[in-house]
Amino acid sequence: EEKDIHIDVNDLACRFIDRYCKNANLSIVENFLCECPVYKPVNDMILIPAKGSFDDEYEFVSAVLHECCHSTMKENRLGRSYPNLKTNNERYAFEELYAEIASSFLCADIGIEIKQEKIDNHTAYVQFWYKQIKKNPEIIFSALNGAEEISEYIEVKGELQELLIESKKEIYTEFDEETNTYDLCV
């Protein structure tokens, strides 16, 4: 007998982030003085403003995932070592490209609906950083490869597949935009 079950993808995203942080031994700290999320490599933590300061759940999840992507630069994770990252514009631009593209991959893999306005924001952000290093058109392929490596690492460390299975078997391709859930078959 089949019965329909709905997965709340926002809940799934939060559980995935929690599991990644736990397994990566990474802290997320809500800081009311913080204006935007930031990964602090020295402390190996992500600082985020109050969740209510984000426009919507997608903004919150994608911003936190963006910072989780930066956390993979740590030596005990993927080890992208950037001495003086903030003063090396090209390396900084690469890191931002990696994180923005990888966080978009992660949101898609989780199943979070991305509205056109958000896609436009991602596109503008990627284009801004791409312009910083556009001397070589091959760079975008390098950024895509780096982003794929990051998203795969985070998915494994955050046990995304296991969370999807825990949330109940196979996902149908039909997404209910009103409830922000997938229809499932158990």
Model feature map: region roles:
Residues 49-52, 81-88, 129-133:
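Glycine- and acidic
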Residues 179-186:
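Non-Sec secretion/translocation targeting segments of pathogen effectors
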